Amino acid sequence: SEHIDPERAKGNIYWDCFHGFRSALAPPDPDDLATTFSDVERQFYETHYTAFIENQNERNAKIRHTERNRSIPDLLSSRKTCPEETIYQLGTLDEHASAEDLLSVVTEFIEKFKAKYGEHIHVLDWALHLDESTPHIHERHVFDCENKYGEVAPQQEKALEALGFDLPDPDKPLSRRNNRKITFDAACRKML
């Protein structure tokens, strides 16, 4: 893309839940990193959600609704079950924190985040981008909890409920404008 500086891209830093920290210099081909992040997310989903998928597909077959069957790629691409991305940036385009300060603040925040919410929210990967106008971090996580069958499944609202988050307006029904994600996002901003 036009806004990416290939020389500065060499300073990008990457982390994922299976391999830990990496840099753009290893592996030397930056395209491998995108594939690797996709692979990391697929591997996490296969490890954690295959039993749910297989059992749900069996239940669908028993009631003759195999058209409802899903696969790991379906979970990864569905708006309701795919990893969620958060972008962290300190400051503006003209006045922003250094990459070192951003990395320090966000890694400390992610550690607190995992300690507090890690039972139901899993940080899969993140990337510190130095190759654009301002340093920023793309972080991806997934929400999950046990369903009524005792299977761990990706489900944001139920995971947040299990973590004790309330609706912003408990007197109103769950809706697009009244959901636990709103309360969770506010708690994360306060924690950061």
Protein language model annotation of sequence segments:
Residues 1-192:
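N-terminal nicking endonuclease/strand-transfer module with a His-rich metal-binding environment
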